[in-house]
Amino acid sequence: TADGTCVRDYVHVMDLADAHFRALQYLERGGDSQECNLGLGQGFSVNEVIQSAERVTGCKIVGCKAPKRVGDPPVLIADSMAVRRILGWKPQFTSLDSIIKTAWDWHRSEKQANR
């Protein structure tokens, strides 16, 4: 990959829940069972995820490099065209920063609530 770290596709938990809800409605209307991938359709490297998390949190993240795992593909990006076509689904959180920001906001609110 461009920066030497694995690239993965991400999807926000609310977008994932929305897709599952749409799938349930589809099946209740008599739709056939389908296997579909969910994702943004674009990948982000491990380094890009770290940089995004640093931007969102304002914290420096200290990482360490490790050897690649055996059999781990360098790039995995979901093709969610089937779920878009069948269910009319599309992600509402379309940037890595927005995905990380909502996770960070949730984490901070949970931490505050559990004090």
What annotation goes with each model-predicted range?
Residues 1-115:
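C-terminal substrate-binding subdomain of Rossmann-fold SDR/epimerase-dehydratase oxidoreductases
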